[in-house]
Curated annotation (Swiss-Prot):
The gene is nnr. Residues 235-515 form the YjeF C-terminal domain. It catalyses: (6S)-NADHX + ADP = AMP + phosphate + NADH + H(+); (6S)-NADPHX + ADP = AMP + phosphate + NADPH + H(+); (6R)-NADHX = (6S)-NADHX; (6R)-NADPHX = (6S)-NADPHX. This is Bifunctional NAD(P)H-hydrate repair enzyme Nnr. Residues 389-395 are annotated as: NADPHX 2.
Length: 519
């Protein structure tokens, strides 16, 4: 297999150049396991990297490692074992009862340390029940493997007392991945944080480390732990972490409102499928604006949709004010599904897009909308997502026939073409390609049964639904491709080749559940 990332223009793979947010790192970690790289291996590599950096800084002596109950603590357990192999004396202090260890990989490595006890000398392991049991240490090196990147806000005991003891120590202070207590996104210290002499972070530089006071981070070293580039290029279940959680106490409509403008005298199924997919994506309210007979058919298909009946058999200028009134209430707008290719519809869509752009409304264009206009009409709209298949892509970007020698060449060409617009392009195919400027994601989910009609409408609805939840145009399109393909695979598994787009839409909640993938 070719190395993912090679030859892709604008895709930055150098670790010192690309800065990750915590969610990017968490997603890459899960996606690596999805590709077949066990997280236990990643933890082993991380812990060994910490031990090696300590060995580079200090020749010998005693190392005290304070470990939390999560993955950061697991890295500390592994580091302890490697430091012992390097000739250091090591003491490990778990902050809490072993039953609180929440990471399966950390629990495995805690078990390894336990199996090494009692040790003939120079190695001890204990756990503290409360902060009163944490004592000052006179070790030569103190390691902070307490909190990692998942903690924000005030620091609770016994972590607080451990941080205070580390900061009072005259030892060489090392933080694992990020100093405990540092906000991993902003670099701010919101309560209390370890002041490290050295921070060993993994895979890539993190937002918070780049922004933080050097007095808190000390020297920062980025170490490779074996996450393949494919874990960041190919979509995977880790990317589901990008979907925002619903706020407790939120009210109807606060978790996304979608407007779908489509349908015509001939087509009512396309906007209905798109609308149901948007609901399944998690949007609270989905409104459909469709011409007469299509609107009545859609209303009869689902009581969960709000349907506005427009005049005539096709969308025309007489409905523009009504469409814009509905759009005012929407968080995203999808246009084109089943709309037909009437001249009046093209005029209405172009005028609506101009007004929606002024309103800064996220827009998704699919199907007939991509035949009624071309890229030059919308090239400056950053809040735009287009979801073409290859024929629609060629029409929208005014292309003639293209021949490529290999997959890499096709990706490079499609990315260059897609950069003609500021928005996001989701090019549907056997391998979906998602582009925005120099950004690229690929998606391999899906199955042959998805040639059935309506699967593209479901994808467009998913994209609009996720966009309404607050995801960026790039992330919503990328996630929609992954979810849509997985829903197709699950529908095929349950119904065989005869599954319909509606069967596929019903699978969406299942494949959006991280538990479906065992994570």
């Amino acid at each position: 297999m070719m190395r993912c990332g090679e030859g892709y223009p604008g895709l930055i793979l150098a670790k010192e150049d690309f800065i990750m947010k915590p969610v990017d790192m968490a997603a890459a970690d899960i996606n690596a396991e999805y590709l077949g790289v066990p997280r236990l291996s990643l933890m082993e590599n991380a812990g060994r990297a910490v031990a090696e950096e300590i060995g580079n800084a200090v020749d010998s002596g005693r190392v005290a490692i304070f470990c939390g109950p999560g993955g950061n603590g697991g890295d500390g357990f592994v580091a302890a074992r490697h430091l012992l192999n390097m000739g250091f004396e090591v003491e490990v202090h778990l902050l809490g009862h072993p039953e609180r260890i929440g990471s399966e990989e950390a629990l495995v490595n805690w078990g390894v340390l336990g199996a090494m006890q009692p040790h003939p000398g120079g190695f001890s392991v204990d756990f503290v029940r409360d902060s009163s049991e944490i004592k000052p240490t006179d070790a030569d090196v103190v390691v902070d493997a307490i909190l990692g990147t998942g903690v924000r806000g005030s620091i609770r005991e016994p972590s607080r007392s451990a941080i205070e003891i580390i900061n009072r120590s005259e030892a060489f202070r090392v933080s694992v991945d990020i100093p405990s207590g540092l906000n991993p996104e902003t670099g701010a210290v919101e309560d209390i944080a370890v002041s490290a002499d050295l921070t060993v972070t993994f895979h890539r530089m993190k937002d918070g480390l780049k922004l933080a006071d050097p007095a808190v981070t000390g020297e920062i070293v980025v170490r490779d732990i074996g996450i393949p580039p494919a874990a960041e290029i190919f979509m995977g279940p880790g990317d589901l972490l990008r979907i925002p959680s619903r706020r407790p106490g939120s009210h109807k409509g606060e978790n996304g409102r979608v407007l779908i403008i489509g349908g015509s005298r001939q087509y009512s199924g396309a906007p209905a499928i798109a609308a149901k997919a948007a609901l399944r994506a998690g949007a609270d309210i989905v409104m459909v604006a469709a011409p007469g007979s299509a609107a009545r058919a859609i209303r009869s298909l689902s009581p969960d949709l709000i349907v506005r009946e427009l005049e005539g058999g096709y969308i025309g200028m007489e409905s523009l004010d009504e469409i814009l009134e509905l759009a005012e209430k929407a968080d995203s707008v999808l246009m084109g599904c089943g709309a037909g290719r009437e001249t009046s519809t093209a005029r209405t869509f172009m005028r609506a897009i101009e007004d929606l752009h002024e309103m800064e409304k996220p827009i998704v264009l699919d199907a007939d909308a991509l035949r009624l206009m071309d890229y030059s009409d919308v090239s400056e709209y950053r809040e735009l997502t287009v979801t073409p298949h290859m024929a629609e892509f060629s029409s929208f970007f005014k292309l003639k026939s293209m021949i490529f020698n290999d997959f890499r060449e096709s990706v490079s060409a499609f990315q260059s073409i897609s950069s003609r617009i500021r928005g996001t392009v989701l090019l549907k195919g056997r391998i979906d390609m998602i582009f925005q400027g120099d950004r690229l994601r690929l998606n391999k989910t899906g199955c042959p049964g998805m040639t059935v009609g309506g699967t593209g409408d479901a994808l467009a609805g998913l994209t609009a639904g996720l966009r309404a939840l607050g995801l960026s145009s790039f992330d919503s399109a990328s996630l929609a491709a992954f979810i849509n393909g997985m829903a197709g695979e699950l529908a095929m598994e349950r119904h065989g080749n005869g599954f319909t787009a509606s069967d596929m839409v019903d699978m969406i909640p299942s494949v959006m559940d991280p538990g479906f993938y065992g994570f």
